[in-house]
Structure formats: C-alpha cells, structure tokens
C-alpha cells in the first residue's frame, strides 16, 4: 500500500509557493504521492483558489520522487488537445511522476453552470469519455484523428510523447452508487471512489469499498496493475490508531491511502504537523 497527501488548494492554501513547500515537506517525511484539487470557483464565494497546473508545475520543480497529479481534473470543462499538451509537459517536467486523476468535476452549479458550461452529468460524462480517448491518441506521438459526437480532430501528430510508457496513468473518480463512473474506471488504471456523506468529508467505509471492488472486478477485462485509492484522516502521533484505520481499507482492496489535508481539517500549522509525522503504517 502506498501513502499520499490530498490537499485542497484554496483558502489558506492558494499560493503555489506554499503548496510546493508543503509537497517538499511531504516528500522528505516519507509520503509517496501529493495530489491537488481542481476547482474553478468552488462552493464558497470570495475564496482564494489556486490553479492546479501552476501548483503542480511548482511542485514538480520543488520535489524529486513523489508522485503528483490533480485529484481530480475536471476534464469536461477543458479542451482535450490543450490538456494533452499540459499533461505531457508536466510529465516531462516531473521526469515521469504524473498521475492523471479524472472525473466530471464538482460542484456542477458553481464550477460549470455559473460560467455557461454544461452542468448536466450525462452530457459531461460523454465529454469525459471522448476526451480520454483523445488524450491517449494524442499522447501516442503518432498521426491521430477523431470523429466523435462532441469532438472532431483532423489528423495531427503531437510531440513530444510522455516520459512514461505506455502512457501517463489515469485514475477515474466516481461517486458511489452511480454505476457509470465505475464502468469507466474499470477500463483505465485506477479508481478513486467517493461516497458523499453530506458533510464535505471522506465517507467511504471499508464495507462500501468491498462492494465497489466486487463491481470493478466483474467489469475489468484488462490485466495488469489496477490502483484503488481511498482517502481519509489518521490521527496525529497515534501509529496504532492509524494502523487500525488503514488496515481495514487495505484488506478491502485499497492500494493507495490519501491523507485528507483540507482547511476544514485544521490550521495550516496543525496540518503541516500531521504531514511531517509521516505516513501511517500497516500492521
């Protein structure tokens, strides 16, 4: 099992320099991944928000080995050919450390409808699926054309290719019990299940994860490694208590634990303290 940080880059975490320093502290403290939110406006008005690609670029320069990426990239409000350029550039800058977390993006009303973007989940899902096909085609470094219901691309060759082979890993987010996101996730490299409890904090239980894993396994035709990402909070200075929490998720099939580091969890100093204590360990 691997351990990373999932940080909300808004409110007191809006400065790319600060975010990159936190990522550096995570790396030297033993965490293996550092993932940032992708929010355009969010659910609160007049809150400072950082652009994820600027933050990730700063992180890539500041760190050496920690995996990085958006968690999750709201692909339906992006042009996939522009995203192809951005992701390859970041993969090169980070020397092959990028993981692309993808999903519909939320909240739909504030991050989409407010700015004249399509808020409907089904239509955004169609856009996401076509965008993923385009990304992989443009990452190939070979002549690629596309004729979808939404996007049309004349034959084009994008160079350079990503550092990673065969391509940049793709993790797909989905809110359980909706089934379409998990059908989508089974086609790619990992799943990031979300279970909304209504309080804006992680609510996925090991029991729910077991049910999700059965669903994923029934759909997954591809071989090879498949990541299962869960997030939550482990207590400070309590290795035994932390192990009790993550052991249950590991037994249910999780391959990554992401520590939830958001302003709602505590002050900057409190959250930095938890990061510097390092990741939890399995029993």
Please provide the spans of the model-predicted regions.
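Active-site-adjacent structural elements that line small-molecule/cofactor binding pockets in enzymes
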Residues: 1-283
